[in-house]
C-alpha cells in the first residue's frame, strides 16, 4: 500500500485560475539519495517515521502521486527597494497541500526542482550548501518558537550545479501554511488584474483568516492581522538576534512566517549594524534596519491592496505597526531578563544592556544564557564575557537590584532560582551559528549527514542543556566570525 494513502492531500491552490501559476513537472536529479528526513514532523501528517524508496521517488519528482499537481507560482516584488515584475518560482514547485492528523493544512514545496517559466537566467537548481542551511535554520527557528516554514526532507544528488564553484545539486522539501507572499498581491495590482487580486485575498482570508469573514470590513481586518503577525515576527527576530538578510517583498509571507532562508545569520557578538548578506552593500537589510524594512514592505503591500481597502483603514493599520512591534519586543526582552513588570528606570537599564554588549563585542546569546544561570554559578561567569569588567559589574549590580524588586504570588519576592528557571526557557543555550552550519556542510558534501543530524537534534530543543552536545554551545572561532554568506544558492 502506498504511504500516501494514509495522508490527506489537496490541490486547492492548483484549483485557482492559471493566471496564478504555470503547471511544471519536476526535472529529476542524478542519483538522488536521502540526506535528512524530519521524522517527528513527518509523523504529524501520518507519514512514516523512517524514509523509504517510495517517498524518495515521490518527493524528488521522479514518480509523483496522483494527488500531486506541481505548479510554479507567479508573483512579483520589490527587491532592495526596486520593483521587479519578472519574479515567480524559478526553481521551486508547489506539489500539493497536506493536512496533519489534526487537520492543519501545509503546502508541500519542492525547492531545486528544475527550470520553470520564471527561472530567468537561473538553472532551476538548488545546491546542497544552501539547502542544508535552510533545513537547519527553519528547524532551529521552530525550536526557538519563532513562526517559520518547516523542512520535511533534504535530498542530495550527483548532479553538478555551478555557482562560485561546482557544487552538488540538492532538493529541499519545504512545508508552510502558505507560500503566498506580499509579491503575489503586487503582481496582480501592477498588472491591473484586480479581479484576481480580490480572488487571492478572498482565498487567503478563507483559508487562513476565517475570523475576518464576519467583520464589517473583512479586508481591513485581514490587513490589520497581517501587520500584527509581521510585527510579532520581526520583534522575535530582534529579540533572538536573527538577521534575515534579504527582506524583499517576495520573501515576505502573508502569514508572518519566516520565509526563504538565504544569507541569514544569528548574531555572535552583539552588533546592531550587523549585515549578514555580503551583497547588501548599503546595509538596507542590516540587523537594526529590519523593523523599518518590515514597515516599508507592509506599505508596499498596502499599496497593492488599495483597490480592496480604504486609505484610512490602511493608514490606521500601518500606523499601529511600530507600537505593536515595540510591545512585542519589550515583552520578549522582559522575559529574557526575567522582569515581568514594567518599572521606572527599565528603559535605561535595557538601553545600557544593549550598549554594554555592543561596546564590548560581547556574544549576545551566551551573555543572556549565563545571566539565566546565576542560580547555579557566581556573577563572574557573566562579567568574564565582557571586556570592560567594571562596566559589566556596574550594569549587573543595577540589574540584580531591579530583579530583586519583582514580586510573585502573594506579594513575595521572586527567588533567583525561580527567575533563572523561567529565563532558561526563553534564552537558548544553542543557536545555529554560521560556523556550525559550515562544519555540517563540509561533512555533507562528502556524503556524511551525521553531523547535520546531531546539530538538528540539538537545535530542535535549544533551551535544554544537552550535556552530550556541549561543543555546539561553544563560541565561534575567529574564522567562524568572518564567514561571508551570499545570495547564491
Swiss-Prot record:
Residues bound to Mg(2+): 251, 260
Cofactor(s), names only, from the UniProt record: Mg(2+); Mn(2+)
Enzyme superclass (EC): transferase
Keywords, in A-Z order: ATP-binding, Magnesium, Manganese, Metal-binding, Nucleotide-binding, Nucleotidyltransferase, Transferase
Catalytic residue list: 250
Pfam family, one: SelO
Ligand binding (ATP): 88, 90-91, 111, 123-124, 174, 181, 260
Keyword Transcription on entry: no
Cysteine pairings via disulfide bonds: none
InterPro entries: SelO
A GO MF label: ATP binding
Catalytic activity: L-seryl-[protein] + ATP = 3-O-(5'-adenylyl)-L-seryl-[protein] + diphosphate; L-threonyl-[protein] + ATP = 3-O-(5'-adenylyl)-L-threonyl-[protein] + diphosphate; L-tyrosyl-[protein] + ATP = O-(5'-adenylyl)-L-tyrosyl-[protein] + diphosphate; L-histidyl-[protein] + UTP = N(tele)-(5'-uridylyl)-L-histidyl-[protein] + diphosphate
Keyword set includes Membrane: no
Enzyme Commission identifier(s): 2.7.7.-, 2.7.7.108
Cross-referenced HAMAP family: YdiU_SelO (MF_00692)
UniProt-listed NCBIfam families: PRK00029.1
Role according to the record: Nucleotidyltransferase involved in the post-translational modification of proteins. It can catalyze the addition of adenosine monophosphate (AMP) or uridine monophosphate (UMP) to a protein, resulting in modifications known as AMPylation and UMPylation.
Family (UniProt): Belongs to the SELO family.
Protein name: Protein nucleotidyltransferase YdiU
Species this chain originates from: Vibrio cholerae serotype O1 (strain ATCC 39315 / El Tor Inaba N16961)
Lineage: Bacteria, Pseudomonadati, Pseudomonadota, Gammaproteobacteria, Vibrionales
Amino acid at each position: 500500500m502506498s504511504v500516501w494513502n494514509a495522508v490527506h492531500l489537496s490541490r486547492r491552490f492548483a484549483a485557482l485560475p492559471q493566471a496564478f501559476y504555470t503547471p511544471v513537472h519536476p526535472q529529476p536529479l542524478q542519483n538522488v539519495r536521502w540526506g535528512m528526513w524530519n521524522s517527528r514532523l513527518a509523523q504529524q501528517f501520518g507519514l512514516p517515521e523512517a524514509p523509504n524508496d517510495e517517498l524518495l521517488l515521490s518527493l524528488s519528482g521522479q514518480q509523483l502521486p496522483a494527488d500531486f499537481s506541481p505548479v510554479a507560482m507567479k508573483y512579483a516584488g520589490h527587491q532592495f527597494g526596486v520593483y521587479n515584475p519578472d519574479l515567480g518560482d524559478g526553481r521551486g514547485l508547489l506539489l500539493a497541500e497536506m493536512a496533519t492528523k489534526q487537520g492543519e493544512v501545509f503546502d508541500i514545496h519542492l525547492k531545486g526542482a528544475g527550470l520553470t517559466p520564471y527561472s530567468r537566467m537561473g538553472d532551476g537548481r538548488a545546491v546542497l550548501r544552501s539547502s542544508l542551511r535552510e533545513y537547519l535554520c527553519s528547524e532551529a527557528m521552530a525550536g526557538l518558537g519563532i513562526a517559520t516554514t518547516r523542512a520535511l526532507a533534504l535530498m542530495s544528488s550527483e548532479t553538478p550545479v555551478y555557482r562560485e564553484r561546482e557544487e552538488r545539486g540538492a532538493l529541499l522539501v519545504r512545508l508552510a501554511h502558505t507560500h503566498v507572499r506580499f509579491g503575489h498581491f503586487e503582481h496582480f495590482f501592477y498588472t491591473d488584474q484586480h479581479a484576481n487580486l480580490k480572488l487571492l485575498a478572498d482565498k487567503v482570508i478563507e483559508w487562513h483568516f476565517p475570523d475576518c469573514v464576519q467583520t464589517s470590513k473583512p479586508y481591513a481586518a485581514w490587513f490589520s492581522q497581517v501587520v500584527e503577525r509581521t510585527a510579532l515576527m520581526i520583534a522575535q527576530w530582534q529579540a533572538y538576534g536573527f538577521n534575515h538578510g534579504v527582506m524583499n517583498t517576495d520573501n515576505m509571507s502573508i502569514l508572518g512566517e519566516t520565509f526563504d532562508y538565504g544569507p541569514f545569520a544569528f548574531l555572535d557578538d552583539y552588533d546592531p549594524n550587523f549585515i549578514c548578506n555580503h551583497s547588501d552593500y548599503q546595509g538596507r537589510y542590516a540587523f537594526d534596519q529590519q523593523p523599518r524594512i518590515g514597515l516599508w514592505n507592509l506599505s508596499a503591500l498596502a499599496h497593492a491592496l488599495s483597490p480592496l481597502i480604504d486609505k484610512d483603514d490602511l493608514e490606521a493599520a500601518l500606523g499601529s505597526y511600530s507600537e505593536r512591534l515595540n510591545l512585542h519586543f519589550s515583552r520578549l526582552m522582559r522575559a529574557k531578563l526575567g522582569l515581568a513588570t514594567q518599572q521606572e528606570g527599565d528603559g535605561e537599564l535595557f538601553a545600557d544592556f544593549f550598549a554594554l554588549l555592543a561596546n564590548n563585542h560581547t556574544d549576545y546569546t551566551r551573555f543572556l544564557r549565563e545571566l539565566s544561570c546565576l542560580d547555579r554559578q557566581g556573577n563572574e561567569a557573566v562579567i568574564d564575557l565582557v571586556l570592560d569588567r567594571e562596566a559589566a559589574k556596574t550594569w549587573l549590580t543595577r540589574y540584580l537590584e531591579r530583579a530583586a524588586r519583582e514580586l510573585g504570588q502573594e506579594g513575595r519576592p521572586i527567588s533567583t532560582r525561580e527567575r533563572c528557571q523561567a529565563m532558561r526557557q526563553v534564552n537558548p543555550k544553542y543557536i545555529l551559528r554560521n560556523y556550525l552550519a559550515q562544519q555540517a556542510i563540509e561533512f555533507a558534501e562528502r556524503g556524511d549527514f551525521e553531523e547535520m543530524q546531531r546539530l538538528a537534534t540539538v537545535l530542535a530543543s535549544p533551551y535544554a542543556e544537552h550535556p552530550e552536545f556541549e561543543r555546539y554551545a561553544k563560541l565561534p572561532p575567529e574564522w567562524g566570525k568572518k564567514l561571508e554568506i551570499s545570495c547564491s544558492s
